[in-house]
Amino acid sequence: MAPGGTINITDRVVMDNYNKKSKGSLNMLYVSEYEGTPASLLLAKLKSYDIESNKERQISNESVKEINRRNTIMRDNSLDIATMVAYTEAGKSITIKEKKNVVIARTKDNGLEVGDIILSADNTTCEDVNDIKKIINNKEENDTVTFKILRNNKEKEVNSKIYLESNSKVVGVVIVTEYDYDIDPKIDIKFKNSESGASGGLMLTLTIYNAITDEDIIKDRKIAGTGTISYDGTVGEIDGIKYKIMGAAKDNVKIVFVPTANYEEAIMTKNKYKYDLEIVRVDNFKEAIEYLKK
């Protein structure tokens, strides 16, 4: 893991009659990752960069393909959440058109894979993750749940065994609910295949809000930030904050939003390298909006 840079999300918006309103921009921050060659490992040691193996990112015995797939799903889920939060805050029309429950991680070899879409559990259609939990909780340890899934556009059934973990009945998967919305105005944000993960949630929410309202919250400033976003607007902790601050400084960002949980390390990085930028800690989306409206 090494210093990264910024991604101008303002330029990624796809929307009819889109008005940027400003010469400034809203940017996500990223960290750089390099394959572990002798040269890159030597550079990491000289620069005191963090070195991690794929095993440190694995849940159970996942493949690299599953890790990458999970990060892509998390990115798309983050956009789902950002859209709901931004439209709700802006008072714009948004209704849920379709839901799907997607496996993003597995802790056991239970027949399910990252990316599987859960169509039903024991012949019962499940609206969300809570419905799946209810079916599991109504069974006993060592019972099985029959999942009908969609994998690679093909339907199939898998049987997953129930076991106890911290006194809770589980089948060893993490599932998120993805949404397809009816929204007005319609908007989308385009990503590159290499861009993944949930840490851009706050900045996606700000970008969508700026696009669908008449307000100009950017005001010709180059603004960056990081942090996950939850449906209640909470901004969550991320990894690699020092490298994101280094990347922001390299790209001449003047305002950086960070989650409160990452604030202390962000300030330490700023002070260590004497960066000329303002670090703003936020607990939720509204705090970021209020700061930009000052």
PLM feature spans:
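PDZ domains, with a preference for the canonical peptide-binding region formed by the helix
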Residues: 120-148, 263-266, 270-271
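Second-shell loop/turn segments in exported
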Residues: 33, 65-77, 104-105, 120-123, ...
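Terminal peptide-recognition signature
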Residues: 87, 115-118, 147, 173, ...
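C-terminal, low-ordered peptide segments at domain boundaries
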Residues: 152-207
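Extended, small/polar residue-biased N-terminal targeting/export presequences
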Residues: 3, 7-98
